Amino acid sequence: GRPLQAFYRDNAEVRGLAELYPDTLEGLASQGHLRQDHPLVGLSPPASFHMDTFEGESRYIHYLRLAALALNEPYQKMVEEAAGKGEHKPCNIKGDARMRNKALAADDHRYEAKPRPAHNIDILRCCVTFEDVASMRKGIEGLVALARKGCGGVGRVKNGFALSDAEAAKSFHYRSWMMNMVVDFGQTFGEMLSKEKAAGLLDKYLRAPPENPDEPWGRWRRDAQAAAEALRSGEMSRRPAVMVCEVQVLLRPYLEARR
């Protein structure tokens, strides 16, 4: 990590990125941690998803992932357009096994309020890499503006450029800037799911064998079907398509150092 340590130490522009902490969406600080079921987001589980057993949370995982499937392509395009000169790298939605493991892990979400999968605020995610500090600052301005469209806003920022030398040493002086944003997609879920491609993605998900090898086919199909029915319900069709998404912003030297 010594080359990255020197790069940060010797470059005032890079160190200046430590100041980038845009204001978060009003109402978040007073209403607890950022979650997908936060009132400002609105992805609460349907009443039919009973939380007295893990079955309800299992269905909720499918519910969130199906919503993310429908929104992933629009999200990636929005970020690519907002990021200016940044090199955008899209990602697949977060995996089922990862979300289940986090919900049950004692050092993760096990003791959080149900539905615990609501803590996954990176189901939709991507990365944008910039060649220099000036273009990175401009790109972050564009991403913050994207976040603040409609009823959305900045949810949380993790600024690795603000870490002390000792803290940065724990990750070999790798630094990045990460933002979770409440994204308003400007349409209802009904409008999003009426599109042929989004509807096809959901149908493909329901027909496919379990993505998670630890999930029996029968349980996977049962819970996925229940989630799809809830997502396609009349109530959900009128709800604005809003979701917490994540974007990681990098400077090229940090990306190259990881290869």
Model segments located where?
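Long beta-strand-rich cores associated with HINT superfamily self-processing modules
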Residues: R110-R259
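Charge-rich, low-complexity segments
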Residues: G1-N120, A134-R137, R259
